Amino acid sequence: LEAINDPELSGFMIAPSNPYLSVDPILSIDKIKQTIMQSNKPRVAVSPIIGGDSVKGPTAKIMEEMGLEVNVMTIANHYEDLIDGLIIDNTDEEYIQAIESSGIKVKVSNILMNNNDDKTRLAEEAIEFLNELS
């Protein structure tokens, strides 16, 4: 909680992790979620879904089993009350208007990370987007 309240913190980033198995358990800790929600710092997530599928892991399978559509709109809806911005892949541009109409800003990029250069580029773009939302 101390790190979350650090005045030097410029915002919050949710990595493209499984929202159901990785992110939600952290956010289920009331003090963590409340502190993030009460902060005036921007909150951005990177979609774990690209083109209707998860890159790795069971995210898409879990979404299907829950009766959810496997797309970035479902991710936006899941994080709707939490995030200010969502970074989606170029292949999912068709969802920009729907996501933005829900009040979430969208940045479109190549979010598939095949190597360290891709990871660095996406991290830099994510920080830039976070700063734009400040």
Predicted segment positions?
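Short, conserved loop/helix-junction motifs that constitute active-site signature segments
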Residues: 34-40, 80
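C-terminal functional extensions of proteins
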Residues: 56-134
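Short acidic, glycine-rich surface-loop motifs adjacent to enzyme active sites
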Residues: 8-22
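Structural motif
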Residues: 10-13, 42, 85
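Short, flexible loop segments at boundaries between secondary-structure elements
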Residues: 39-56, 111-113
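Charged helix-capping and loop-helix junction motifs
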Residues: 25-34
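A short, well-structured juxtamembrane/interface segment
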Residues: 1-6
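Short glycine-rich anion-binding loops that position phosphate/pyrophosphate groups of nucleotides
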Residues: 17-21, 49-51, 92
